[in-house]
Amino acid sequence: MTAEQRRNLHAFGDYVRKTLDPTFILSYMAPWFRDDEVQHIQAEKNNKGPTEAASLFLQFLLELQEEGWFRGFLDALNQAGYCGLCEAIESWDFQKIEKLEEYRSLLRRLQPEFKTTINPKDILPEIAECLISQECEEILQICSSKGLMAGAEKMVECLLRSDKENWPKTLKLALEKEESRFSELWMVDKGAEDVKMKDLEDDEMKTCDVQIFYKEEPENQNLSQNSCSSSAPHTYSPLKPRKYQLELALPAQNGKNTIICAPTGCGKTFVSLLICEHHLKKFPRGRKGKVVFFAIQLPVYEQQKSVFSKHFERLGYKVAGISGATSDTVCVEQIVENSDIIILTPQILVNCLTNGTIPSLSVFTLMIFDECHNTSKQHPYNVIMFSYLDRKLGGSSDSLPQVIGLTASVGVGDAKNKAEATEYICKLCASLDTSVIATVRDNLEELEEVVYKPQKFFRKVELRTTDRFKCIISQLMMEIESLAKSIFEELGTITLGGLFQIQNSNFGTQKYEQWIVKVQKECAVFQMPDKDKESRICKALFSYMSHLRIYNDALIINEHARMKDALDYLKDFFRNIRAAGFDEIEQDLTQRFEEKLQELESISIDPSNENPKLRDLCFILQEEYHLNPETRTILFVKTRALVDALKKWIKENPKLSFLKPSILTGRGKTNQNIGMTLPAQKCVLDTFRTDKDNKILITTSVADEGIDIAQCNLVILYEYVGNVIKMIQTRGRGRARGSKCFLLTANADLIDKEKMNMYKEEMMNGAILILQTWDEAVFKEKIHQIQIREKIIRDNQGKPEPVPDKKTKKLLCKKCKAFACYTADIRMVEKCHFTVVGDAFRERFVSKLHPKPKSFGNIEKRAKIYCARPDCSHDWGIYVRYKAFEMPFIKIESFVVEDIATGVQTVHAKWKDFNFEKLSFDAAEMAGGAQDLGLQGMGN
């Protein structure tokens, strides 16, 4: 080891202390460390933590004089899994680790919410690559011995020390996969124009635009006349379609763009198979069709990929699928080219159209949109159709694919009458460029034998006359709000958007929870000059907001279930808080709860506090099972906490325990409520289908989204109402002959809303009938006019491009402030890459062979470039071969921009945020400058 290396290791010691747990590499350092030193380091970790242990380790390390210890240290880091730290020390470039600091800071301030929201066991497999193997084992051990909150705290501690540059994004993907509400707060974002540069730089291919839309998952049930249970093993055989399914498929098989609107449970998935098979077989020899089927959610994507594969691979067609979970590891262009049928989540195609991986929609001959009622606003479906309609209205000579939409309800939006409903449906048809709405008309009798429409009943019930439980919890919430207010007063003029705009009367509502989430998001991004104070304030506010959210949940449970269930929910939360090891704020909040606990216990067991809603629900269930002991029931509720509470109530109620309830919830997680995996959902449904003793299924909205559920003759909506589309879905669960559907609520407005939904359904059906009587040419002209109008609006709504700033500015190295180039020398390549022309710039950087050389289109990535100053070596970008030229591609995030006239300096994370005159690359400017990189000392 040289003296310079020793000095550097001492200088960069803070990075080692913040990252390394030395106990994980001590076994690899045995040749250099004495036993007493090893024991001293281990004791330091046990007593003071890994940072102090790393400091002691570094002290011993720098005192070593034996030959080879530095190489041994690097090898130990590699073997233990500290690859990022090892790479940084080898190159003395800690920029990648430094860039993680903003995410560490964000995670520190989000820690209170993380530990109350996340189940570490569920996301650990997804993020294990970002941790050391021993850390994963420690997290699991703590989960088992101390509980999930303590395990989540340990996971945060480990992530804060991770040296893996991709851990923030890996965590984001894991949270999204588990549909965790925490993912809304974990903000890891990249602009669309920068994605391509990142593709070249980091081999990442994702954008992260998250929007929430209503979804109806495709059903497997009633696919055909010889359909069988999804749980029964069988060899796939061709299915025989029903007459109404052939009727639904006919317009599409005749080549017309069509919306297929048919009830849940009738087998729309099977109809899409019929259309797809007919489409592929119609092409003459020498030509081939190419179908893309869009599914919005990952479970639906997986289900449809399986269904299409089983049906079409026996016919010799190649079926492939690409989702957000797989797009990083596959070549989208190649899969699309080599497959006959591609199942996609729609954002994948949006990304590919944006970056040019797929040049246009003309590569497809048929597009099928599942849940097509979502084709509005900025939903990926609509973005895809914008591209389609721009080509159509622009007179492109390229052939466009046939378009098919599938839905149980087209909806009517805010329509007040049949004319407005007709206009709304026409707009949906215009968005999908469809001139036919296919419904079952000639074979209604057969459809009604498959899908029965239940009778609808409304039950208005009363609330408790007095609610002491709510009064006590509301008082605790007001105290917490006061504590939070004192934090805001400490901030002085700095505010986060007005904490106290929500009145106490909103406790126990969804509106109050939305406000909590809003405050948490604002806390996550606000900044102060004093970073320690900023961290302390953010952490305190997150603790207060987390407790307010739990109390809010408890009030909702109390309103709709037993006080006992709400109290149990709170006790579970505080039990987990204690097991996790709480700070002073949490100790104070826990003490406040415990002071009221005895009174809450007494109130919760008082029979006079029984919930009138449960009394009425018990009466309905007893009455229906008395009339028909074979009744099968689905009970819809709003939240997972209510699912658990009502299950406990039924099991503990001697009048209802014979129902043997099972539960079905979604895959995401909220607070203490753990979501169900896809296999767990299937297991519940199979049991409900086959076990006659299991008479009631309690579920959230997941069951109105097309999951394959056995026929039921009783549907109960317990304070559960949505829009007209959701109403049709939930009602569709009552499929048995003679079915009944009850809406049970204490809120008269919900009954009015459901009646309005029924009226809107009539309007929708009437509007569809009107449109089906229109002459097709008239209908086409109508939607064409809508398309033209919408395109004009869309074009005019585009953000105006800022006037380019033509003043010349300097780019300085962000690390050492060395001069790099002038903006006048920067040229834009393919709209998203930026190079610098002129030989002078080549003297200001050095290069090293790229560890992952790769080609993308016209670009071959060859080397990394760094600031030429020996004491800097800051990462500036990459060196590429573009067509016939060798050139650098620089990253604006690596530089400081200085205004020559004023001396003002600014930084920009993305090129699109930097306003200057962006001149396009001209090959003539490269004359004489296209020397090979090897002449400049490749490998410097």
Swiss-Prot record:
Disulfide bonds: none annotated. Residues 219-928 are annotated as: Interaction with ZC3HAV1. Ubiquitously expressed, with highest levels in spleen, liver, intestine and heart. Up-regulated in tracheobronchial lymph node and tonsils during porcine reproductive and respiratory syndrome virus (PRRSV) infection. The modification N6-acetyllysine is found at residues 861, 912. GO terms for molecular function: ATP binding; ATP hydrolysis activity; double-stranded RNA binding; RNA helicase activity; single-stranded RNA binding; zinc ion binding. This is Antiviral innate immune response receptor RIG-I. It comes from Sus scrofa (Pig). It is found in: Cytoplasm; Cell projection, Ruffle membrane; Cytoplasm, Cytoskeleton; Cell junction, Tight junction. Residues 738-928 are annotated as: Mediates interaction with RNF135. Residues 1-87, 92-172 form the CARD domain. Keywords: Acetylation, Antiviral defense, ATP-binding, Cell junction, Cell membrane, Cell projection, Cytoplasm, Cytoskeleton, Helicase, Hydrolase, Immunity, Innate immunity, Isopeptide bond, Membrane, Metal-binding, Nucleotide-binding, Phosphoprotein, Repeat, RNA-binding, Tight junction, Ubl conjugation, Zinc. Zn(2+) binds at residues 813, 816, 867, 872. Residues 613-779 form the Helicase C-terminal domain. One of its GO terms (cellular component) is ribonucleoprotein complex. The lineage of its organism: Eukaryota, Metazoa, Chordata, Craniata, Vertebrata. Residues 795-928 form the RLR CTR domain. There is a cross-link at residues 48, 96, 154, 164, 172, 190, 815 (Glycyl lysine isopeptide (Lys-Gly) (interchain with G-Cter in ubiquitin)). GO terms for biological process: antiviral innate immune response; cellular response to exogenous dsRNA; cytoplasmic pattern recognition receptor signaling pathway; innate immune response; positive regulation of defense response to virus by host; positive regulation of interferon-alpha production; positive regulation of interferon-beta production; positive regulation of interleukin-6 production. A motif (DECH box) lies at residues 370-373. Phosphorylated in resting cells and dephosphorylated in RNA virus-infected cells. Phosphorylation at Thr-773 results in inhibition of its activity while dephosphorylation at these sites results in its activation. ISGylated. Conjugated to ubiquitin-like protein ISG15 upon IFN-beta stimulation. ISGylation negatively regulates its function in antiviral signaling response.
